[in-house]
Amino acid sequence: MSTAYYLSKLSERRRSVAVMVGDVGVGGDHPIVVQSMTNTDTADIDATVMQVSALWRAGSQLVRITVDRDEAAAAVPKIRERLERLGIFVPLVGDFHYIGHKLLVQHPACAQALAKYRINPGNVGFGAKKDLQFSQIIEIACQYNKPIRIGVNWGSLDEALLTQLMDENAQQEKPLSMAEVMREAVIQSALHSAFAAEKMGLGRDKIILSAKVSDVQDLIAVYTLLAKRSDHALHVGLTEAGMGTKGVVASSAALGILLQQGIGDTIRISLTPEPGGDRTREVKVCQELLQVMGFRQFVPVVAACPGCGRTTSTVFQTLAQKIEANLCKNMPIWREKYPGIERLKVAVMGCIVNGPGESKHADIGISLPGTGELPAAPVFIEGKKVKVLRGHHIAEEFEEILSDYIRTRFGQHEQKRA
């Protein structure tokens, strides 16, 4: 499990029923969980193990994998075994569509190896087969004591339910808009499926709900209503958010509003990666969103000014980038070696206007000289000026001071253990 420092005020969170997914708690009093999904062919064991490992190292606490055919289902226990040999015990979530009931029955080792099953009510079965095939998955979840996520997506919404609601709406004196009917269909699909699963014997502490759409305002509306009508743990995410900056902005806008309202027990930011791009980016964006909102703390904060006409030198920018990269690189080791280091705040400022003040507010900071200022850089530690650096090696000297500060402040348990 992640050892990230948890800042969320639980009294402000929507109260939900806690669900254990492997050893990761979702909902209840547990911190908001970051999760991701592979885009490998699950039958390709080497590629899937490699990507799950990368996502886990980036900080994904749950990793979902596609289970779409026999070869993929047969690979799941082997993937689980390979990961554990590497010391990686991240819970794996099976993503099932259309034939999940068959795959789980025919591959019991897969059913056992997975920590959770994702079911899409829109394609678990059609017509008379829908209830039967849904019940088969629930029976297996009960048999192996596994939680499920009932994951509704408006791109694969239950057409029969949508048609029924549209027909009923057309008979109303003041009919709702098409968007409102669509939202209600998404919500009802999730709630009806959860109720059916509970009637079949699956506990409320085994059910997570999601109701994903691709429009920001629709997503906010859907989850706001769903949160009022259910106390199930909620998985929140904007589906098909898109590529690059657009995807990051859209997801952050939607999730930021919901999280601020206390809605969301686990999140995924679904980014379309560039060809050959880094799949772990979506994990980092999730972490950054939770961190800037003050819900969780994953890595030290490096505050740096944006630059202006007073900072024609790029020294402060280069130093800030270097320090941030070094902190991120060392965090996997430092989390264990220096408990609490994720709460560290470092300021690297570029001129006298805000530099000294911002540096004083940080745990440790430096105010580099701006254009026309004296070539001196005061260093502040815990609000007090401790040194003034001069010359051509200011950056290197500050890095040494920072390293000493980290060892002194956070390395106390190392000294005790020695």
Curated annotation (Swiss-Prot):
Q: Name the chain's protein.
A: 4-hydroxy-3-methylbut-2-en-1-yl diphosphate synthase (flavodoxin)
Q: In which pathway does it act?
A: Isoprenoid biosynthesis; isopentenyl diphosphate biosynthesis via DXP pathway; isopentenyl diphosphate from 1-deoxy-D-xylulose 5-phosphate: step 5/6
Cofactor entry? [4Fe-4S] cluster
The record's Gene Ontology biological-process terms are: isopentenyl diphosphate biosynthetic process, methylerythritol 4-phosphate pathway; terpenoid biosynthetic process
Enzyme Commission number, as recorded: 1.17.7.3
Q: Name one GO molecular function term.
A: 4 iron, 4 sulfur cluster binding
Which keywords describe this protein according to UniProt?
Answer: 4Fe-4S, Iron, Iron-sulfur, Isoprene biosynthesis, Metal-binding, Oxidoreductase
Q: Where does [4Fe-4S] cluster bind?
A: 305, 308, 351, 358
Q: Kindly state what the record says about how the cofactor is bound.
A: Binds 1 [4Fe-4S] cluster.
